């Protein structure tokens, strides 16, 4: 481990000890807000303190085993103990480095999934449908709930656009690296000459805003329209203008909801999406500014970035953000087996974050 990372760990361990002292102070215990804040921080630092303590014990075991190695009768046993201790120290070192990576506060959020057909006409819409189905299948494997917010079907299948809310523990942490342009190479069903076409679709993963998220929306900045729903809900949706479309005038962001029976419920859902969109826009602008000073490919979330190619004739899927990340398992991946891809992307992101921490003052 680099000295800079070790110093950060030592500082966090000292902070953990300080928090334990503070929480034992009767004055702090009587202050509900401070006690809650310190308790939360202590809980976040506890894994680091526990792992550091285990590392200290393992180093002591290693030193004892090295002392025994000088005894001819104990040498063989000592060599075994040394090997075990060294392997465990390597594991603990890796764990400590991972624990240094700041947790994304949005990781446990629900999310909005937006899939839109790009270049490629009807084939792009069909591919957008394939992607949405892929994410839906993955959500089913994770026991997450998928709620379609709105959709515009393609003329020959798939979707020109489909927006859904995904509800489940850790949903955003698993899918946040899916934002970007996805490209497909295959022979369309309508292609009589058997030629391979290239089409594209864009994916946006937007974390649902926390109820106490720090963003204010001026009602005067909103244009709210009602219209008759064309979505689910039976004949009722065609009788009343229950669907809601909200335009945020300063940014031009437009959201709508038509899946609920009441206008009030649709307005609440649309406002949640608008809030999430505006917060994500702020975060994206900040991330773009940071990217000007450092190269962080995996976690950029740039929707214009071409992130992945799905080559059906070769059964190949390539993620362009990670060197040599090509899997010849497209049939299973398109059916929702995304973990091999997601795990590699998370590992790459962790490596990038560790490199950034190592170079930080």
UniProtKB/Swiss-Prot annotation:
InterPro entries: PCRF (IPR005139), Pep_chain_release_fac_I (IPR000352), Pep_chain_release_fac_I_sf (IPR045853), Prokaryotic/Mito_RF (IPR050057), RF-1 (IPR004373). Pfam families: PCRF (PF03462), RF-1 (PF00472). The keyword Nucleus does not apply. One of its GO terms (cellular component) is cytoplasm. Keywords: Cytoplasm, Methylation, Protein biosynthesis. Gene3D superfamilies: 3.30.160.20, 3.30.70.1660, 6.10.140.1950. Residues 283-306 are annotated as: Disordered. The modification N5-methylglutamine is found at residue 235. The keyword Acetylation does not apply. It is found in: Cytoplasm. GO terms for molecular function: translation release factor activity, codon specific. Disulfide bonds: none annotated. Methylated by PrmC. Methylation increases the termination efficiency of RF1. Peptide chain release factor 1 directs the termination of translation in response to the peptide chain termination codons UAG and UAA. Belongs to the prokaryotic/mitochondrial release factor family. This is Peptide chain release factor 1. It comes from Xylella fastidiosa (strain Temecula1 / ATCC 700964).
């Amino acid at each position: 481990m680099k000295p800079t990372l070790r110093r950060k760990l030592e500082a966090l361990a000292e902070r953990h000890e300080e928090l334990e002292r503070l929480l034992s102070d009767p004055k702090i215990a009587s202050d509900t807000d401070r006690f809650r804040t310190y308790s939360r921080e202590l809980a976040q630092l506890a894994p680091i303190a526990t792992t550091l303590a285990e590392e200290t014990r393992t180093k002591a075991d290693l030193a004892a085993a090295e002392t025994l190695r000088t005894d001819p009768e104990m040498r063989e046993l000592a060599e075994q103990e040394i090997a075990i201790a060294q392997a465990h120290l390597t594991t603990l070192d890796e764990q400590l480095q991972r624990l240094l990576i700041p947790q994304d506060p949005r990781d446990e959020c629900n999310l909005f999934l937006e899939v839109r057909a790009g270049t490629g006409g009807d084939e792009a819409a069909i591919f957008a449908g394939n992607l949405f189905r892929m994410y839906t299948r993955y959500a089913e494997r994770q026991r997450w709930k998928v709620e379609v917010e709105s959709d515009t079907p393609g003329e020959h299948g798939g979707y020109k656009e489909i927006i859904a809310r995904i509800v489940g523990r850790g949903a955003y942490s698993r899918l946040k690296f899916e934002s970007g342009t996805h490209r497909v190479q295959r022979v369309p069903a309508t292609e009589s000459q058997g030629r391979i076409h290239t089409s594209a679709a864009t994916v946006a993963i937007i974390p649902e805003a926390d109820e106490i998220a720090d963003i204010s929306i001026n009602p005067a900045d909103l244009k709210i329209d009602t219209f008759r729903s064309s979505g689910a809900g039976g004949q009722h949706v065609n009788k009343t203008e229950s669907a809601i479309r909200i335009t945020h005038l300063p940014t031009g962001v437009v959201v709508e909801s038509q899946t609920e029976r009441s206008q009030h419920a649709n307005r609440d859902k649309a406002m949640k999406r608008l809030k999430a969109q505006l917060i994500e826009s702020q975060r994206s602008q900040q991330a773009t500014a940071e990217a000007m000073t450092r190269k962080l490919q995996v976690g950029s979330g740039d929707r214009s970035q071409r992130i992945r190619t799905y080559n059906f004739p070769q059964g190949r899927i390539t993620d362009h953000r990670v060197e040599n990340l090509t899997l010849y398992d497209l049939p299973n991946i398109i059916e929702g087996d995304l973990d091999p891809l997601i795990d590699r992307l998370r590992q790459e992101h962790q490596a990038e974050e560790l490199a950034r921490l190592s170079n930080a003052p």
